[in-house]
């Protein structure tokens, strides 16, 4: 007995035959019948386009010539899901044939939750890079201005200068972290990557302690009414640069013994070594808010009627510190906020946090340097001095100041006449 053909082979031959006949008149008739069976019947008189199926699989019904036909977007195409509430468009041409090109431009892909998360993550990364670039650029300009303008180098501006320096170093180490840390480095947990993390956290802490120095200076000058001449630069150097160092050393020792993995980034469940440096940051932030509450209270009561230039400077400094402390406080407290499971809340949290975290340096340079009236006045004087030195008017004035009269008697002629 000769065995008959297998069912799988018959199915393969049938599919092959259907594929070969797809563009044939027989296939066109099958397509037309298929579309007519799926779509409601439409009666048209005159020239018309027959029902057809395009390469994507969308059925286009029998339509009158010149008509722009709309059909829902395909639900799936090449494994990608699309929004079927939008439409694709195809024109029935005057010769009774369908346009070769179908307009599927309004068909949008329905992103999965994983794809949406990746998209928002990439946008947040772009915001972070943009913000840190802008911040670093403006901070460097502010640093150069404070360095060059020696006429405004008082204790208050020296504190501003050091705060800007701390932000520059923090932004620079952020770029080092982003450009050198990758999954392989994280897993290797080499010494240099742990040192980079420690340096970044150190400069992060110095930002808060220099803000604390700003608050201490204003509180001493306004609330305690001490003469600021009694304050010394070394006191603020100790607050801003020295105190954070043992804090980070203690944190590094804790990480080394209890959480020594992934270049000391992140934290394991049940391990709280990061609070060694986060705790002091929160503490000085709260103390600064108390300082500013007292400062604002004094300014609103005792100094309201005063219009001296020193009081105006204090008021501007308080406004800048209030804004910056709010920014620093909000961004840091956001790390302790749970945005919840709602997708919109998480998206807002990601973007808001990325923006404030990356643009902090920009706000610091704007409020403490570019809007500082002393800096602006000194820059204006420098600019006018430079203009006077290099202007054509100055050259002409210098040239005309030289005596050129024909009655001028030279020293040589006097010498000759006396000799005679």
From Swiss-Prot:
GO terms for molecular function: corticotrophin-releasing factor receptor activity; corticotropin-releasing hormone binding; corticotropin-releasing hormone receptor activity; G protein-coupled peptide receptor activity. Residues 1-28 form the signal peptide. The lineage of its organism: Eukaryota, Metazoa, Chordata, Craniata, Vertebrata. Residues 29-116, 180-194, 259-274, 337-343 are extracellular. This is Corticotropin-releasing factor receptor 1. InterPro entries: GPCR_2 (IPR050332), GPCR_2-like_7TM (IPR017981), GPCR_2_CRF1_rcpt (IPR003052), GPCR_2_CRF_rcpt (IPR003051), GPCR_2_extracell_dom_sf (IPR036445), GPCR_2_extracellular_dom (IPR001879), GPCR_2_secretin-like (IPR000832), GPCR_2_secretin-like_CS (IPR017983). One of its GO terms (cellular component) is plasma membrane. The transmembrane domain is composed of seven transmembrane helices that are arranged in V-shape. Transmembrane helix 7 assumes a sharply kinked structure. The gene is CRHR1.
């Amino acid at each position: 007995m000769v065995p008959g053909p297998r069912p799988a082979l018959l199915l393969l031959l049938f599919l092959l035959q259907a594929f070969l006949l797809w563009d044939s008149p027989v296939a066109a008739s099958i397509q037309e019948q298929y579309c007519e069976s799926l779509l409601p019947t439409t009666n048209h008189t005159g020239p018309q386009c027959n029902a057809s199926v395009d390469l994507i699989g969308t059925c286009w019904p029998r339509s009158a010539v010149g008509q722009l036909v709309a059909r829902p977007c395909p639900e799936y195409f090449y494994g990608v899901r699309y929004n079927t509430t939008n439409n694709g468009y195809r024109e029935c041409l005057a010769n009774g044939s369908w346009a070769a090109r179908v307009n599927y431009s309004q068909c949008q892909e329905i992103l999965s939750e994983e794809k949406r998360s990746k998209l928002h993550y990439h946008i947040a990364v772009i915001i972070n890079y943009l913000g840190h670039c802008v911040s670093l650029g403006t901070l460097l300009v502010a640093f150069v201005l404070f360095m060059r303008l020696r006429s405004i180098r008082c204790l208050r501006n020296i504190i501003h200068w050091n705060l800007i320096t701390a932000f520059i170093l923090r932004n620079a180490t952020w770029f080092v972290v982003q450009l050198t840390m990758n999954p392989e480095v994280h897993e290797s947990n080499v010494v240099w990557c742990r040192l980079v993390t420690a340096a970044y956290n150190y400069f992060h802490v110095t930002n808060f302690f220099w803000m604390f120095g700003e608050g201490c200076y204003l509180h001493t000058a306004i609330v305690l009414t001490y003469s600021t001449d009694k304050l010394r630069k070394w006191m603020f150097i100790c607050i801003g640069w020295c105190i954070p160092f043992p804090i980070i050393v203690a944190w590094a020792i804790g990480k080394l013994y209890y959480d020594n993995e992934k270049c000391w980034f992140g934290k394991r469940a049940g391990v709280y070594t990061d609070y060694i440096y986060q705790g002091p940051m929160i503490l000085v932030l709260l103390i600064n808010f108390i300082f500013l509450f007292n400062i604002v209270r004094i300014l609103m009561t005792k100094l309201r009627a005063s219009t001296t230039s020193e009081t105006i400077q204090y008021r501007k400094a308080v406004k800048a510190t209030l804004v910056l402390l709010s920014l620093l406080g909000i961004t840091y407290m956001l790390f302790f906020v749970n945005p919840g499971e709602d997708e919109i809340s998480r998206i807002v949290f990601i973007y808001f946090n990325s923006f404030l975290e990356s643009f902090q340096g920009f706000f610091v340079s704007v409020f403490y340097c570019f809007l500082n009236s002393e800096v602006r006045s000194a820059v204006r004087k420098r600019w006018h001095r430079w203009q006077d030195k290099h202007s054509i008017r100055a050259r002409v004035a210098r040239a005309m100041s030289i005596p050129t009269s024909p009655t001028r008697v030279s020293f040589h002629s006097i010498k000759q006449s006396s000799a005679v």
